[in-house]
């Protein structure tokens, strides 16, 4: 897309993009599907995201660099507007564009592209983190229009699952050992993800070393603190959290255990199938996080310090997509 635009770098479309081969003002002229392909969002949602982050009043005052002689941050001067920088960051997240490519596309140095993306990822992560309690939708609010696929779970508040992201082998030997998972045979960081009955993100932890158990993930995160008595939580069998839920008078919906029996009862089969059908939506949500190519394949050591920020930002950005859980049974679900 940007290759075709290179020869038109000075074309006027409301503002001059005299240095950059690519800028937001050019790309917002693209068809909606093309813009979504590169950023994961439509032009309208991009504008809403920019306003949610404070608009130009806040975004124009972000600081990008430290000088060695003073702790005061310095701000870049140049052609890139706040929207250009947000666009650059979304482009890197969604398409996994390298810093060297961003240098060419936006006609800036590689180090500057790195600082812009780093700053915006940290900024968005901190802003989204402020919304965590609001995002954990109450049971009562979900009851107002609970999707019919959850009609058998009247008090269900959150559906949880754990997911891992592959990382480069850490240089620290202890971190390398703790992040290696025998199951996957490579190094990972692990997150607990929870969604509401409407399919939106309710909760996401910081990243933990990949060898952590699901139960330990529950214990070391603040997840249980968000729950109230008589809430319902849905998970798979691996979390081993019955005692934790009992302590807080929380109902736990998990598939039935066979134990030493040879077969499930008919009631248990129906119950387990209902849970399986409902739990698939958290897996769909996690799949949408991994559509962001910067975290999908390999998180390098250079990005490891902000790995939790990367995944959190991608998870929150999924909330800006159209709902994928049908409210009514007749609706078509797009998975």
Explain the meaning of each model-derived region.
Residues 78-80:
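Short helix-capping and inter-helix turn/linker motifs at the boundaries of alpha-helical repeat units
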């Amino acid at each position: 897309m940007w290759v075709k635009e290179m020869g038109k770098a000075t074309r006027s479309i409301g503002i001059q993009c005299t240095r950059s081969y690519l800028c937001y003002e050019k790309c917002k002229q693209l068809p909606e599907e093309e813009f979504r392909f590169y950023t994961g969002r439509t032009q309208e949602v991009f504008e809403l995201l920019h306003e949610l982050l404070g608009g130009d009043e806040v975004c124009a005052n972000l600081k990008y660099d430290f000088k060695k002689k003073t702790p005061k941050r310095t701000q870049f001067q140049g052609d890139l507007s706040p929207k250009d920088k947000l666009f650059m960051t979304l482009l890197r997240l969604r398409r996994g564009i390298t810093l060297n490519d961003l240098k060419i596309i936006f006609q800036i140095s590689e180090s500057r592209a790195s600082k812009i993306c780093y700053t915006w990822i940290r900024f968005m992560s901190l802003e989204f983190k402020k919304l965590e309690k609001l995002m954990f939708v109450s049971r009562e609010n979900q009851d107002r229009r609970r999707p019919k696929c959850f009609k058998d779970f009247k008090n269900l508040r959150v559906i949880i699952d754990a997911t891992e992201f592959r990382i480069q082998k850490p240089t620290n030997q202890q971190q390398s050992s703790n992040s290696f998972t025998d199951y996957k045979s490579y190094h990972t960081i692990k997150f607990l993800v929870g969604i509401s009955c409407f399919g939106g993100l309710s909760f996401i932890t910081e990243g933990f070393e990949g060898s952590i158990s699901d139960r330990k993930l529950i214990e070391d995160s603040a997840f249980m603190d968000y729950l109230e008595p008589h809430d319902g939580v849905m998970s798979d069998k691996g979390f081993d959290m019955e005692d934790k839920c009992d302590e807080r008078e929380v109902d736990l919906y998990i598939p039935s255990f066979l134990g030493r029996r040879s077969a499930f009862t008919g009631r248990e089969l129906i119950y387990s199938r209902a849970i399986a059908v409902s739990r698939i939506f958290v897996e769909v949500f996690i799949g949408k996080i991994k559509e962001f190519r910067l975290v999908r394949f390999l998180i390098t050591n250079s990005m490891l310090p902000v790995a939790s920020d990367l995944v959190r930002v991608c998870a929150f950005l999924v909330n800006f997509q159209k709902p994928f859980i049908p409210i009514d049974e007749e609706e078509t679900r797009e998975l």
